[in-house]
Amino acid sequence: MKYSVITINYNNKDGLKRTIKSVVGQNYIDFEYIIIDGGSTDGSVGVIKEYAEDITYWVSEPDKGIYNAMNKGTSHATGDYLIFMNSGDCFHSFDVLSSITDYQEDIICGKILRGNSAKPSGLHKDSITFIDLMRDALPHQAMFIKREIMNKYPYDEKYKVYADWKFCIESIIIGNCTFRNVNTIVADYDIGGISANSNGRLHQDKDAILKELFPPRIVTDYQCLAYIDDELIDQSRVLTQTVIARKLVKGFTNYILRFMKKK
């Protein structure tokens, strides 16, 4: 299995160097490394040239934002799976890539560590639902995405901070792509890095995406459900199944009794 590791950078020389070290230090051999720099002026290009032998493709030129740069990286990728490890973010350990090779789903998602936190963040259950995504986005630093899926659902560049969330909605929820949640800690997330600058327009983008993809009544229902505790939702499912089961048993019993009476 071949991976394409893609790093987006703009004027984050120190963060870029940490990221590159974590990528080239992987013990898995079959991967390519792509760096898309947005025309940095802080010495980032010098860092890239320092590691040029380990980089498959790189470019430094102005772009139209992070998602434009990420799509640009995708266009140069040839791997089976893509992962975006943007400047400042790092692979958690040297064996991350080798630990994912047994999975074949369209999208594989692990965990991240935020800043100095010792508690992993990410999805903590096997499946994923629309409600889960209404509550939070999946960490792109921990997502391995099949290249054909990324090409089918490229990042929508009109959304400046939440296009990766739209990708998850379109691919997993609407497109019904196969999904695997794993307990592997994939990345150490730099809370001051390029991927952290998303709070300004997040809610604005999210509302616009929901309006674009779903009828208002569906959005309203799921917005309400997103604030209900998982345990309560699970209990409701069990209750519903119990009621249905009782009705089925009762109906079957009545049928048998009627059949016996006829005899």
Task: List each model region and its residues.
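Glycine-rich, basic loop-to-helix element that forms the pyrophosphate-binding segment
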Residues: 19, 44, 60-77
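Conserved donor NDP-sugar-binding/catalytic core segment of glycosyltransferases
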Residues: 90, 94-121
